[in-house]
From Swiss-Prot:
GO terms for biological process: tRNA pseudouridine synthesis. It catalyses: uridine(13) in tRNA = pseudouridine(13) in tRNA. GO terms for cellular component: cytosol. GO terms for molecular function: RNA binding; tRNA pseudouridine(13) synthase activity. It holds the Pfam family TruD. Residues 161-312 form the TRUD domain. This is tRNA pseudouridine synthase D. It comes from Nitrosococcus oceani (strain ATCC 19707 / BCRC 17464 / JCM 30415 / NCIMB 11848 / C-107). The gene is truD. The active site is at D84 (nucleophile). Keywords: Isomerase, tRNA processing. InterPro entries: PsdUridine_synth_cat_dom_sf, PsdUridine_synth_TruD, PsdUridine_synth_TruD_CS, PsdUridine_synth_TruD_insert, TruD_catalytic, TruD_insert_sf, TruD_pseudoU_synthase. NCBIfam families: PRK00984.1-2. It comes from the Bacteria. Belongs to the pseudouridine synthase TruD family.
Length: 358
């Protein structure tokens, strides 16, 4: 597996490699994330939904605290996904009380690291991935570089999007999740526990997807449909296969109605055809062990957009802070660090780069 000194994948850039540098996460307020739900909550039901603002706090740890306070099992607590530990995150949780007395959440939870913003009832548990997206406010301090070049690159991203790589969070510290995957798929002991197993399978899928996307970025066709392309409809998981590429289809892609896609590997035949499938098979030919491991684990073939559209992207250079400040929205499953890597070479003030709750 190709990686740099930090254990991360070497991936092609959508534009020129960035030369500007900055520090990320000098303080929690420098990395702010707010979850956006895709539906309204009913106000009735056995599930209590809590909107919590957490500061430098692990998502799984907080879920355990909610279970303890409510006297329920951890499985009765829902959250849409893991959020970066190092930052200020506004995140939804749900707790299935099933007739139990509701705790005084504010009294039980309020601390220097957790604030209760809203409590509301709903009829269902919050499922993983059940988000419209996330809003980000990022402050990169000690910025050094050509502001005009950075503004030009950000303008390109605002207009045309950026490669939709999985971020290094998915692969663990120094890529250690990938090392565990390789040992497992090479005949080693399977991971203990459903959580670790799911995390490693997700890392393996993400690695293979990134390999395909990087190859297409290098070929400058990551935003263009190839014959046989499985095109994902914007804002959904649905896709259709284009055996041939005509001007009408290319116009739809230019309008961002649909996007070229790459594989999330699993059982079954890839929906990609012709040139698109041939490229994916060539790129993944050296990873037969990983593909077989994912298939044996029971995962099914899925697709992910190669192109990430960054909504409401705005930026400024606050003079008093010697920094670059970014505000944008991303769909569920996309990574802010994927946007940042195209613009600035960042170093983490808190230590290891871009760590997710683990």
């Amino acid at each position: 597996m190709e990686a740099d000194e930090a254990g991360q994948q070497v991936l092609a850039y959508g534009g020129d490699p960035p030369l500007a540098t900055a520090l990320l996460r000098c303080r929690p307020e420098d990395f702010q994330v707010v979850e956006e739900l895709p539906f309204a909550l009913s106000g009735e039901g056995e599930h209590v939904w809590l909107l919590l603002c957490k500061r430098n706090t692990n998502t799984v740890w907080l879920a355990r605290q909610l279970a303890r306070i409510a006297g329920v099992r951890l499985v009765d607590v829902g959250y849409a996904g893991l959020k970066d530990r190092h930052g200020l995150t506004t995140q939804w949780f749900s707790v299935n009380l099933s007739g139990k007395k509701e705790p005084a959440w504010a009294t039980a939870l309020e601390s220097a690291t957790v604030q209760v913003l809203k409590v509301i009832r709903h009829s269902r548990k919050l499922q993983r991935g059940a988000l419209k997206g996330n809003r980000f406010l990022l402050t990169l301090r000690h910025f050094q570089g050509d502001r005009e070049v950075v503004c030009d690159r950000l303008t390109q991203i605002k207009v045309a999007g950026t490669p939709n790589y999985f971020g290094p969070q998915r692969f663990g510290r120094g890529g250690q999740n990938l090392d565990q995957v390789h040992r497992w798929f090479s005949g080693g002991k399977p991971p203990r526990g459903r959580y670790l197993r799911g995390m490693l399978l997700s890392a393996a899928r993400a690695f293979l997807f990134n390999r395909v996307l990087s190859e297409r970025v290098q070929a400058a066709n990551w935003w263009q449909p190839l014959p046989g392309e499985a095109l994902i409809l914007d804002g959904s998981h649905g896709f259709f296969v284009a055996e041939t590429i005509d001007e009408a289809l290319q116009a739809r892609v230019r309008r961002f109605d649909c996007h070229p896609s790459g594989p999330l590997w699993g059982r079954g035949e890839s929906p990609a055809k012709r040139m698109s499938r041939a490229l994916e098979e060539e790129v993944l030919a050296d990873y037969a062990l990983w593909r077989e491991g994912l298939e044996q684990a029971g995962l099914k073939q899925e697709r992910r957009s190669l192109r990430l559209m960054v909504a409401d992207l705005e930026w400024s250079f606050p003079p008093a802070m010697d920094s670059l400040q970014l505000h944008f929205r991303l769909p569920a499953g996309a990574y802010a660090t994927t946007v940042l890597r195209e613009v600035v070479r960042t170093q983490e003030a808190v230590g290891q780069p871009f760590l997710l709750d683990e």
